[in-house]
């Protein structure tokens, strides 16, 4: 197999139309900016043989606004690349070089990388963001029963293995920075899900994870779990 593919979408409208209607309602959308998706499949394909795959996604200074909603996306820029070797001759990875979202009183900047993707993923993630969930709820046409609100401020850097999280071995998590949640809530009445939080978290994790937490209120409820702090 030696295949190269490329999809050029003229705007975010094409991308948003790929999102299942169970998540976003179909509604008139005005969008600008370019979206490019390209990659390759190379190598042997057959019994106990799988080709290598690459993927590169680029969104360049895109903007969008749904009709009849007060807020829109002023600027969305993102670049993502990935490589997967199913035969594991070479290490696989996923690399988010940049994700930048501006609009609706929200400014999100993030980057991250996952190495050893098919083994024990080694995760690195950094974000510096101010998120107004109340305004975002007036940016996207959420389905009936889904509601979000409050504010989230995040400025932290994370490094850990996936197995560390699965084993809840928090001492091996490298996490440094802060996470603030003010009157935050996520609800989906159709799925009987609710999460609310009013908390300020500070993390110090150069060698071992340490944290200072001021949790004024936190609750999680769904069909299987009910917890309050």
Where are these predicted regions, by residue range?
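Short beta-strand segments that buttress and anchor functional surface loops
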Residues: 96-103, 214-220
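Membrane-proximal interfacial segments on either side of biological membranes
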Residues: 1-95, 106-214, 228-229
């Amino acid at each position: 197999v030696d295949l190269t593919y490329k999809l050029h979408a003229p705007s975010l409208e094409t991308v948003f139309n790929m999102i299942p209607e169970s998540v976003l309602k179909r509604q008139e959308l005005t969008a600008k900016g370019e979206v490019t998706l390209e990659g390759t499949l190379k190598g042997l394909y057959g019994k106990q043989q799988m080709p290598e795959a690459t993927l590169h996604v680029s969104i360049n200074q895109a903007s969008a606004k749904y009709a009849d909603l007060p807020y829109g996306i002023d600027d969305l820029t993102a670049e993502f690349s990935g490589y997967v070797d199913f035969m594991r001759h070479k290490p696989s990875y996923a690399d988010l070089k940049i994700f930048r979202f501006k609009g609706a009183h929200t400014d999100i900047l993030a980057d991250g990388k996952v190495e050893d993707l098919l083994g024990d993923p080694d995760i690195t993630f950094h974000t510096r963001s101010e998120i107004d969930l109340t305004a975002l709820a007036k940016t996207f046409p959420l389905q009936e029963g889904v509601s979000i609100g409050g504010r989230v401020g995040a400025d932290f850097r994370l490094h850990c293995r996936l197995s560390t999280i699965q084993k809840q071995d928090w001492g091996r998590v490298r996490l440094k920075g802060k996470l603030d949640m003010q009157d935050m809530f996520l609800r989906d009445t159709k799925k009987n899900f609710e999460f609310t939080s009013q908390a300020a978290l500070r993390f110090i994790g150069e060698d071992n994870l340490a944290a200072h937490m001021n949790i004024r209120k936190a609750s999680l409820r769904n069909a299987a779990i009910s917890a309050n702090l």
